[in-house]
């Protein structure tokens, strides 16, 4: 009986937000759940910048309040704290923090730090034991977590079509710290939460649509964001008025089998190490997993991001280059719903060459070994 329960629980545990959250309060239409995990994690690699302790923890809550029979308020917050640094360093940050209202079948609207709608599709392949989901990144326009997202979501198409979901999203500008890079000193591009150019974004809009039926899923998402002054005028590659993303994905999740693939094409939106962005990039991720009843979940995946027409890097002109390319082989063993251990081997297929060195892109293999407690 225990092994059968594990086979049912594990897919739920893979969903962001920890499906097995601890209920703290549930009374009079008010509900509060607490969730989190501690990952005792170690990397083994010839790349000394990542080799060693990578321990971290995450803690979050989800809350709901019943305003009326048809209106529900909700909020979520999630925080990450690194456990591999001395106490004198501040290595912690907010992953998500948003609040919203849900109007029964009409849909929901929320605002705050959240996931971009592109991730509605690309998240299907972001399920590896440790690695994966790195053909994009956080604070990368509307591709993953970011600030200032206003999101409308509709589930089951107004209650009329089971499994048909769509979302529309707007992201406000997150610009520079002080505008000191603007020679006109006009102040455009300055925001109260300024950051370096690689993490900035202008106003953006996006949308996604997904359909799930008996274990099969298909989805598509698009986004288009203005780029900031800093992003186009501080010597970074991949300049342009807008950053655009177009993605499509497929998945199968049934009978203990999980298969997923996504293809994304971006313009001025995929980061090239520390150098800037690819004028055009083609990103591909595919993963296959199987859940054994006794708790073992092996995983194999392939990920590639190829930059096109990159331009001049360190005095040399580059056309097409692989930004990321690796095979991932791993496995997770679930002792129960709260305790698991995993190993994940990232087999790096990139060559150590002038381009990867100039961009600061790692070309070494990494083996990750982790022991996880989650609630």
From Swiss-Prot:
Keywords: Cell outer membrane, Ion transport, Membrane, Porin, Signal, Transmembrane, Transmembrane beta strand, Transport. The chain crosses the membrane at residues 22-27, 30-44, 51-66, 71-82, 92-103, 106-113, 147-156, 164-172, 202-212, 216-226, 242-254, 257-267, 280-292, 295-309, 321-335, 339-348, 365-375. Residues 45-50, 83-91, 114-146, 173-201, 227-241, 268-279, 310-320, 349-364 are extracellular. Its main location: membrane. GO terms for biological process: monoatomic ion transmembrane transport. Homotrimer. Forms mixed heterotrimers with OmpF; other mixed heterotrimers are also probable. The N- and C-termini are two parts of the same strand. Extracellular loop 3 folds back into the lumen of the barrel forming a constriction zone that controls the pore size, while the trimer interface is formed by the packing of hydrophobic residues on the outer edges of beta strands 1 to 5 and further stabilized by extracellular loop 2 which reaches into the neighboring monomer. One of its GO terms (molecular function) is porin activity. It is found in: Cell outer membrane. Residues 1-21 form the signal peptide. The keyword Transport applies. This is Outer membrane porin C. It is a multi-pass membrane protein. The gene is ompC. SUPFAM superfamilies: Porins (SSF56935).
């Amino acid at each position: 009986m225990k092994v059968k329960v594990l086979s049912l629980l594990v897919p739920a545990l893979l969903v962001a937000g920890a499906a097995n959250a601890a209920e703290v309060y549930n009374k009079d239409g008010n509900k509060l759940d607490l969730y989190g995990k501690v990952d005792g994690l170690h990397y083994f690699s010839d790349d000394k910048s990542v080799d060693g302790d990578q321990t971290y923890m995450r803690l979050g809550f989800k809350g709901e309040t019943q305003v009326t029979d048809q209106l529900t308020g909700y909020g979520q917050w999630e925080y990450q704290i690194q456990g591999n640094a001395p106490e004198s360093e501040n290595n912690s940050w907010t992953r998500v923090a948003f609040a919203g209202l849900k109007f029964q079948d009409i849909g929901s609207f929320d605002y705050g730090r959240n996931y971009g709608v592109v991730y509605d599709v690309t998240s299907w392949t972001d399920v590896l034991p440790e690695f994966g989901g790195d053909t994009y990144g956080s604070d990368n326009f509307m591709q993953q977590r970011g600030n200032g997202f206003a999101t409308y979501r509709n589930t089951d198409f107004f209650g009329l079509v089971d499994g048909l979901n769509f979302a529309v999203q707007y992201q406000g500008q997150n610009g520079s710290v002080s505008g000191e890079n603007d020679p006109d000193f006009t102040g455009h591009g300055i925001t109260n939460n300024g950051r370096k150019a690689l993490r900035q974004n202008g106003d953006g809009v996006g949308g996604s649509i997904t359909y799930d039926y008996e274990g099969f899923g298909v989805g598509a998402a698009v986004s288009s964001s203005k780029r900031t002054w800093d992003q186009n005028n501080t010597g970074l590659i991949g300049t342009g008025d807008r950053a655009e993303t177009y993605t499509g994905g497929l998945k199968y999740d049934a009978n203990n089998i999980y298969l997923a693939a996504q293809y994304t094409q971006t313009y001025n939106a995929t980061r090239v190490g520390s150098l800037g962005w690819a004028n055009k990039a083609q990103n591909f991720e595919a993963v296959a997993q199987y859940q054994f009843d006794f708790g073992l979940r092996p995983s194999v995946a392939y990920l590639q991001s190829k930059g096109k027409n990159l331009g001049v890097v360190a005095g040399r002109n580059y056309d097409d280059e692989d930004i990321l390319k690796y095979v991932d082989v791993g496995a997770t063993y679930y002792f129960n719903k709260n305790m698991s251990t995993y190993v994940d081997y990232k087999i790096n297929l990139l060559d150590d060459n002038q381009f990867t060195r100039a961009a600061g892109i790692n070309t070494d293999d990494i083996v990750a070994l982790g022991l996880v407690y989650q609630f």
